[in-house]
Amino acid sequence: MKSVQKSSPLLLLIAGAKGAVGSTVAVAASALQKDTEKVLPNLTTADMFAEVLPANQIFVAGWDSSDKSLIDSVLDHEVLNEKIWTGYKNDLEQIHIQEVPESHLTPKAQVEKLQDDIRNFKKRYIGAKPVLINLLPACGDVDLSHCNNLSDLYDELKSVAFPDMMYTIAAVTSGVPVVNFSSNSLEVPVIVNEAIKHNVPISGKDGKTGQTY
């Protein structure tokens, strides 16, 4: 039987890292690094990728607009009993979460800021494979299917509130795969073409059904 080569560590770049889902993922990643067996039995997919990705090599970074600390966010959301995560406070304090791009910036400038953040994350976690996880809130239907290129897309994004798209453009053009956990549609033709061009996958849709709508 052909042996399976273990992959590099995984770096989850979470847009919305201090939300209820993002902060819980941060705790889980911290727990996996120290107490793997406390977490794995509760994951339905635990055995599916065990030979590919060591569970204790999953790291978290990302962005959020909240000025609260990640620890305060975990505490406020009350998803996890405090006894479960207090042992990982020091680990949570080490998780690097960047500020979101300032809203007065043009869409292109916001993307450039995020691209710079991604470069810095890669330097911080040398050898890890980054993946963007979109946990931003639902923003309603935004039709961008008529945009023919990134320039058109940037122009259109000037008049709509769709921050997910800036993160997606930054990730795809940086060679970073995208997992969309929100109900917002990211797979517009321009983005699909860029993903093909940069050879990166985009997957997922609406992992928070019941919360976003």
Ranges and model annotations:
Residues 2-182, 186-197:
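Metallocofactor- and cofactor-centric catalytic cores in central/energy metabolism, strongly enriched
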Residues 204-213:
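Extended amphipathic alpha-helical segments with heptad-repeat/coiled-coil character used for oligomerization
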